[in-house]
Amino acid sequence: MGKVILGIETSCDETAVSLVEDGRKVLISLLSSQVDLHRLYGGVVPEIASRRHLELIFPLLDEAFRKFPREKIAAVAVTYGPGLVGALLVGLSVAKSLSYALNVPLIGVNHMEGHIFANFLEDANPVFPALVLVVSGGHTDLIFMRGFGDYELLGETIDDAAGECFDKVGRVLNLPYPAGPVIDRLSKKGKPIYKFPVARLKEEGYNFSFSGLKTAVRVFREKNPEAKVEDIAASFQEALVRALVENTEKALKECMPAKLYLAGGVAANSRLREEFLNLGKTYNVPVHFPSLQYCTDNAAMIAAAGYHRYLSGKYAPLNLNAYPSLMLGEERY
């Protein structure tokens, strides 16, 4: 057996535990979602999320250890940022305790790096340099990746993240939280007949802006209450995907990567996946995105990223802290 890494993820509203061998073979992947709990409030409530993580993490670990001998674990990898500080501290405290008790290295993993590494759980042929678009509820980042752990941030959102925009538009349309999957489904029943604006920033670069799009949908809805929700959803989704794809295409032409990757919760969007495949065909660049189960927060991606840090000897001290605003590529130990 190769090196088995225990991954722990508690950065937001998903409590997850996973055991992954050699960064690729998922032996166990357990997850308990808090979506139903936070749906009552239309979004994640940090205090509730932290308390729920405390209730869920130990049963998940017990289940994992019933299926796999803990003495065969080579290291414990845990998300230490970015995310909700209280939620992060739950996973971090448990990971430190396990590292000490099992006498194995502790490895701190950046949550965004975890999303990127979700691709490498399944991609048998990672190629670099690569262009990576990470789209989630809290981030919209376009990244040039020269190799494992070598990142250059090309562009990011200057206001709302793409996933955040989905949820805010969902509230305008009276859709349940999280709105992203609902809008995706509704869009397949509607037509993108309304032309919502796509922000084109004046400065050079690859930054994104979605606040104007969100406002445009709200104003349109107020002025056109009779418009079909399915058509509004399809039109909004088309505009948002267009914004993501246009910047990615611009970077693709200028950076000439060997491969194109998509990551993060919004990577599950069917229209975005379709357009990324079209980009790959147009520019003859291979495209990879995670299977749906690894797009949203999970611990397998944390274990995968942790494995590569383990190979590099990047072990964290037991006084490792949580960093809610941790940047990709930023090292805090």
Curated annotation (Swiss-Prot):
A single GO cellular-component term on record: cytoplasm
Cofactor note: Binds 1 Fe(2+) ion per subunit.
TM helices/strands, residue ranges: none
Cofactor(s) recorded in Swiss-Prot or TrEMBL: Fe(2+)
GO biological process: tRNA threonylcarbamoyladenosine modification
Binding site for Fe cation: 111, 115, 297
Molecular functions (GO terms): iron ion binding; N(6)-L-threonylcarbamoyladenine synthase activity
Enzyme class: transferase
Keywords (A to Z) from UniProt: Acyltransferase, Cytoplasm, Iron, Metal-binding, Transferase, tRNA processing
Enzyme Commission number, as recorded: 2.3.1.234
Pfam families found in the cross-reference section: TsaD
InterPro entries with a match to the protein in the record: ATPase_NBD, Gcp-like_dom, KAE1/TsaD, Peptidase_M22_CS, TsaD
Reactions mediated catalytically: L-threonylcarbamoyladenylate + adenosine(37) in tRNA = N(6)-L-threonylcarbamoyladenosine(37) in tRNA + AMP + H(+)
Subcellular localization: Cytoplasm
Signal peptide segment: none
NCBIfam families, alphabetized: gcp_kae1 (TIGR00329), T6A_TsaD_YgjD (TIGR03723)
Family label: Belongs to the KAE1 / TsaD family.
Protein purpose: Required for the formation of a threonylcarbamoyl group on adenosine at position 37 (t(6)A37) in tRNAs that read codons beginning with adenine. Is involved in the transfer of the threonylcarbamoyl moiety of threonylcarbamoyl-AMP (TC-AMP) to the N6 group of A37, together with TsaE and TsaB. TsaD likely plays a direct catalytic role in this reaction.
Protein name in the entry: tRNA N6-adenosine threonylcarbamoyltransferase
Species of the source: Carboxydothermus hydrogenoformans (strain ATCC BAA-161 / DSM 6008 / Z-2901)
